[in-house]
A protein has these predicted regions:
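Short, electropositive alpha-helical surface patch
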Residues: 80-93, 118-131, 157-167, 194-201, ...
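Non-cysteine beta-strand/loop elements that form the S-adenosyl-L-methionine
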Residues: 27-33, 64-68, 174-180, 209-221
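Conserved, mostly hydrophobic/aromatic
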Residues: 21, 69, 87, 98, ...
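Active-site beta-loop-alpha junctions enriched in small/polar residues
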Residues: 7-11, 34-36, 71-73, 111-113, ...
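Active-site acidic/histidine proton-transfer and metal-coordination neighborhood
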Residues: 76-175
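Gly/Pro-rich active-site loop or hairpin
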Residues: 117, 154-162, 184-255
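Acidic (Asp/Glu)-rich catalytic clusters
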Residues: 19-25, 45-67, 93-102, 131-138, ...
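N-terminal pre-domain/capping segments
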Residues: 1-70, 74-96, 281-283
Length: 283
């Protein structure tokens, strides 16, 4: 089955994310478990955890349909030891919150070297930060997101992500999330069915579909290989609808959260329906 949804608001309590997903006809969703623009957050209460789990059961959601996202402040590759420690501790807390909610994966941007150290050294710091979080949680996967490579952000290429994974001790609990806008901006041309197939063959060779634990389905306002991260509604950007038709016809993308982060929430229910249509078309 295809699990399709969007990154919905959890304002007023994490359980509201479930209700907000249902309201747009989604059977998957992403959420922040805390304010993504602040370092500290009060711990989840027993009541909040209980309400979330009850909502999940009531609406028939399982962990594999949910792709939580961590705070944008976190940079596991930060060359400054003090700032990096702050990021690692915040990442551990994010992973623990996911575990408390009965979920099994946390999506995150790997980090940036800030042009202060070699990229490879920064990637090693990221690997070590991931290990720290995995050692303090159980049953939760750290899911590395492909990036556009804006600024000094790492994870722009499949090779960089593979490098981060191979230097971690706990590789069995590391997954990957591919963002269609990001990989296009990073230089992977997926605008045609042939291009999409070629890029996914490359992904399989370098990382492997066995690690794929989610997708972010975004059209791109940014141009090809621009290394600029700008999302657009489906069919309204430089990708067009072809890659999404190809993706939805490929059974490898079933049974994982396919998450819209497109720029107009009012269109999400229509975009979900459109993707469902693509998924049922006979080729």
């Amino acid at each position: 089955m295809h699990y399709i949804g969007a990154h919905v608001s959890a304002s007023g309590g994490v359980h509201n994310a479930v209700e907000n997903a249902v309201a747009i006809g989604a059977n998957a969703f992403a959420l922040f478990t805390k304010n993504q623009k602040q370092w500290k957050a009060p711990p989840l209460t027993e009541e909040q955890i209980s309400l979330f789990k009850q909502a999940m059961v009531a609406h028939g959601f399982s962990a594999k349909q949910v792709l939580p996202h961590d705070s944008y402040l976190i940079n596991l590759g930060n060359p400054d030891p003090e700032k990096r420690e702050k990021s690692v501790n915040a990442f551990i807390e994010e992973m623990q919150r996911v575990e408390q909610l009965g979920l099994d994966r946390l999506n995150f941007h790997p980090g940036a070297h800030l042009k202060q150290i070699d990229a490879d050294d920064s990637m090693l710091l990221i690997s070590q930060g991931i290990d720290s979080a995995l050692e303090q949680t159980e049953g939760v996967y750290a899911v590395i997101e492909t990036t556009a490579g804006q600024g000094s952000a790492l994870g722009r290429t499949f090779e960089e992500i593979a490098r981060i994974i191979e230097r971690a001790k706990h590789q069995d609990r590391i997954g990957v999330c591919v963002d269609t806008c990001h990989i296009f901006a990073a230089g992977y041309d997926i605008r045609t069915a042939e291009g999409f197939a070629s890029v996914m063959d490359e992904y399989e060779r370098i990382i492997g579909f066995d690690r794929l634990m989610g997708m972010h389905l975004n059209d791109a306002k940014s141009t090809y290989a621009s290394r600029v991260d700008r999302h657009a509604p489906l069919g309204d950007g430089n990708l067009g609808l072809a890659p999404f038709k190809t993706l939805m016809a490929d059974p490898r993308f079933k049974n994982m959260p396919l998450i819209l982060e497109t720029t107009n929430p009012d269109l999400w229910s229509q975009e979900i329906e459109l993707l469902r249509t693509f998924g049922t078309e006979k080729n």
